[in-house]
Every structure is written in structure tokens, then in C-alpha cells.
Regions:
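Condensing-enzyme catalytic core mediating Claisen C-C bond formation in acyl metabolism
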Residues: 3-7, 30-34, 217-300
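A glycine- and small-aliphatic-rich helix-loop capping segment at beta-alpha/alpha-beta transitions
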Residues: 20-27, 116-130, 180-183, 203-216, ...
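Glycine-/small-residue-rich "gating" segment that lines the acyl/pantetheine channel
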Residues: 127-134, 172-175, 179, 196-252, ...
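Acyl-CoA/ACP chain-elongation machinery
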Residues: 37, 185-231, 264-278, 305-312, ...
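Conserved beta-ketoacyl condensing-enzyme motif
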Residues: 6, 27-165, 194-205, 298-311
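ACP-dependent fatty acid/polyketide chain-elongation machinery
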Residues: 1-65, 248-260, 352-366, 410-412
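Active-site-proximal alpha-helical scaffold in enzymes
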Residues: 76-89, 143-154, 159-195, 233-255, ...
Length: 412
């Protein structure tokens, strides 16, 4: 079987515009959740989010092209530019060299894509007529345009894939890239998960199904994974990117190697459109598959940990079941308490965070652990990051519709 390694990483979220700043803030236990600034949310039951307020899309795009790309695409370009530069693949013109282009692909993921663009253009259409719809609307909203824009940006001519699996999309994008390399469809893949749904219809829609925390007066305490007083997730936005590469190709060009891909697991709940399967049965099967493939001792788990009642409870049960007992479960944390739930971007972001945690020997905390929940009784690295050397990390992502993805990385 072909070995696959990580040779480049990048991310942007409410705590940082790059991976170094982001991880430093996460390790410090900082929180990027605050009151929404991008629109007037005063009439909404939810008025908080993990919003990125200091990102200028003209840093990664020609100003005249900004209107052609939805914000989720702009965030993807920011993260992928960092990852591609980090990988050392780019030539003097910031392009994938022609001799590598045909054997490099893109695997992207997003849960909803250009929701804000859909909302805005729907209003234009109904209020001002169809002639007022932006001619760039469709191509700014389609999920697979992440791959379209990034492949054009870097001259990547291999497989161009897209995963649309709600909150598991970023993780499934990693898995699809792995499968492509394993089957010799490419030697390297640029993976990116991106999401930006902090808009009236996004907040309103998730609030209407009681999925979001209403702790509006305490934004930084609103997302509290595994805490007894949790009452919903907080929307985040961002993008995470990784360059996955066949080991021999990476060694040949003397690339820096961050980690080696060890295993993946996928499953479906066939249970409910929003609720997880009882006791996390689907999550258990995905984790079991990943662990059986990886054959490593996992030292840290970045949990899906959304700060919703059933997800956190059932994920905790699934972890105990898959590792054999409460005592055998390694340290677990959810970084969603700090940057919010970035939906389809979450899996890619959390994979980057997990790999950085492994390499730096710093396990991120689960913040806002104040009231223990007897149903969530694992070691969640409460409130303060922990210095600990681990050789392998696991990242979980579970999405609406009962779609589950798990990835494991190990030290190279």
C-alpha cells in the first residue's frame, strides 16, 4: 500500500489568519466567539458566532475578482495558499510546476457552500427582478468551486473532487484524497475544507431547529463541549488545508514531512436527519474502522464535540466502547469551544490542529469545562492545554444525515 504523508498545512479561523497564530491562541485557551458584526442580529434568538473580522480577500485575490467568489471560496484560497507555500511545491510564479501538475489534484469539502450568496441573490431576484441577479452568483455559490478556484490559482490539473457531507465534509475531503493517492490516481492532493454561513438565513435556520447556543450575554462561554450546561453549538467560519503526498514523491523532492496518514473510517447512521444514532453506534463503527486500519496507539482525540446534548453524550459513549473502557480512552478535547463549529470546514481545520498538537507536544484544551456532566466522564483536557508527547492522533467528524468520518495521523 502506498504511504501518504502531510507536507503542507494552512488554516484560517476566528482565532488566527494562519496556522501558527491559530494554534498559539488555541493552546493558550483563547476564544474567538463574539457578537456578530457582519449583519444586524439584534432581532435574532442567536447573536453570537466565531466570526473572522480581520480578513481581507484582496490579499489572496485580485480586487476585481473578489465579487466572483463566495466568502467560503475566499477563505479556502487563504488556507490553500498557506498550505501550498508551506509544502514547497510552488515555483517562482506561485504555481504547481508543469511536470507535477497532471499528477496533483484537489479534494475540497463544504457543508453548504455559498449560503450568503444564495440568500442575497434570492432577495435581489424577488424584490428587484431576475435581471438584478449577479451574473457570478451560481459560480460563487457552488461547493465544487472551491476546487475550481484553487486548481486555477495553482495550475493543478489532476482529479478535482468535492465532498458535500455537512459537518463531516472536511474529513471526507481528506479521505477522498487518500483514496485517490492509494489507487494511484495522483501522487499528491491539495485538501481543503471551507465554510462561511454566518448570515441571516444561516443563523436563523440553525436557530430554528434549536441547534445553536442562546447564551448571547456570554459569547466566550457559550460553546462548552461536554459540560453539563451546554445548550447548543456556536457557528464558526474558516478553512483548513493540507497537502497530502505519496511518501516516495515527497522524499524525492526532500519535502518537509509533518505526519503520515495512518487510517480512516466512514459510516452512516441510517437513524435521523439531525440526531446521532443512539450511543454513537455509527461513530463507533467509523472509529473502529480507522483504528483497525491504522494499527497505532492513539494518544489524543480531537472530538466532534459540538456542545450539543446528544452529540457529546453519544460520542463519549462511542469512545469508551471503541477503546474498551473509560480508563483506556486517551485524552480528548474539542476545539469548537474556541473557534465555533465551522461545519464543513471543521474536519480539515481539526486535522491541522491535531497534527500540530502531535508535533508540538501540546494537547488543546476543552474550554468552559465548569460543571461536570456524569454522562460525559472522560478526560477532556479541561480548560488548560496539556504538554504531552503522543505518536498518533485521531480526528472525528459527524454530520447531519448520519454521515461520519474519522481520520488518524501518526508521526512520520
Amino acid at each position: 500500500m502506498r504511504r501518504i504523508v502531510v507536507t503542507g498545512m494552512g488554516m484560517i479561523n476566528s482565532l488566527g489568519l494562519n496556522k501558527e497564530d491559530s494554534f498559539l491562541a488555541i493552546a493558550k485557551g483563547e476564544c474567538g466567539i463574539k457578537h456578530i458584526e457582519s449583519f444586524d442580529a439584534s432581532a435574532f434568538p442567536v447573536r453570537i458566532a466565531g466570526e473572522i473580522t480581520d480578513f481581507d480577500p484582496t490579499e489572496v485575490m485580485n480586487p476585481k475578482d473578489v465579487k466572483k467568489a463566495g466568502r467560503f471560496i475566499q477563505l479556502a484560497l487563504k488556507a490553500t495558499r498557506e498550505a501550498m507555500k508551506d509544502s514547497g511545491i510552488l515555483d517562482a510564479h506561485n504555481r504547481c510546476p508543469e511536470e507535477l501538475a497532471n499528477r496533483m489534484g484537489v479534494s475540497s469539502g463544504s457543508g453548504i457552500g455559498g449560503l450568503g450568496n444564495i440568500e442575497a441573490n434570492s432577495i435581489f431576484c424577488f424584490e428587484k427582478g431576475p435581471r438584478k441577479v449577479n451574473p457570478f452568483f451560481i459560480t460563487s455559490a457552488l461547493v465544487n468551486m472551491i476546487g475550481g478556484f484553487t486548481s486555477i490559482e495553482f495550475g493543478i490539473k489532476g482529479p478535482n473532487l468535492s465532498s458535500v457531507t455537512a459537518c463531516a465534509a472536511g474529513t471526507h475531503a481528506i479521505i477522498e484524497a487518500v483514496k485517490t493517492i492509494l489507487l494511484n490516481g495522483a501522487d499528491r492532493m491539495l485538501v481543503v475544507g471551507a465554510e462561511s454561513t454566518i448570515c441571516p438565513v444561516g443563523i436563523g435556520g440553525f436557530a430554528s431547529i434549536k441547534a445553536l447556543s442562546t447564551r448571547n450575554d456570554e459569547p466566550k462561554k457559550a460553546s462548552r463541549p461536554f459540560d453539563k450546561d451546554r445548550n447548543g453549538f456556536v457557528m464558526g467560519e474558516g478553512a483548513g488545508a493540507l497537502v497530502l503526498e505519496e511518501y516516495e514523491s515527497a522524499k524525492k523532492r526532500e519535502a518537509k514531512i509533518y505526519a503520515e496518514f495512518a487510517g480512516y473510517g466512514e459510516s452512516g447512521d441510517a437513524n435521523h436527519i439531525t440526531a446521532p444514532a443512539p450511543e454513537g453506534e455509527g461513530a463507533f463503527r467509523a472509529m473502529k474502522m480507522a483504528l483497525e486500519m491504522a494499527k497505532v496507539e492513539v494518544g489524543y482525540v480531537n472530538a466532534h464535540g459540538t456542545s450539543t446534548h446528544y452529540n457529546d453524550w453519544y460520542e463519549s459513549i462511542a469512545l469508551k466502547n471503541v477503546f474498551g473502557s473509560k480508563e483506556k480512552v486517551p485524552p480528548v478535547s474539542s476545539t469548537k469551544g474556541q473557534i465555533g463549529h465551522c461545519l464543513g470546514a471543521a474536519g480539515a481545520l481539526e486535522a491541522v490542529i491535531s497534527i500540530m498538537a502531535m508535533n508540538q507536544g501540546i494537547l488543546p484544551p476543552t474550554i468552559n469545562q465548569e460543571t461536570p456532566d456524569p454522562e460525559c466522564d472522560l478526560d477532556y483536557i479541561p480548560n488548560v492545554a496539556r504538554e504531552k508527547q503522543v505518536d498518533a492522533v485521531m480526528s472525528n467528524s459527524f454530520g447531519f444525515g448520519g454521515t461520519n468520518g474519522v481520520v488518524i495521523f501518526k508521526k512520520a
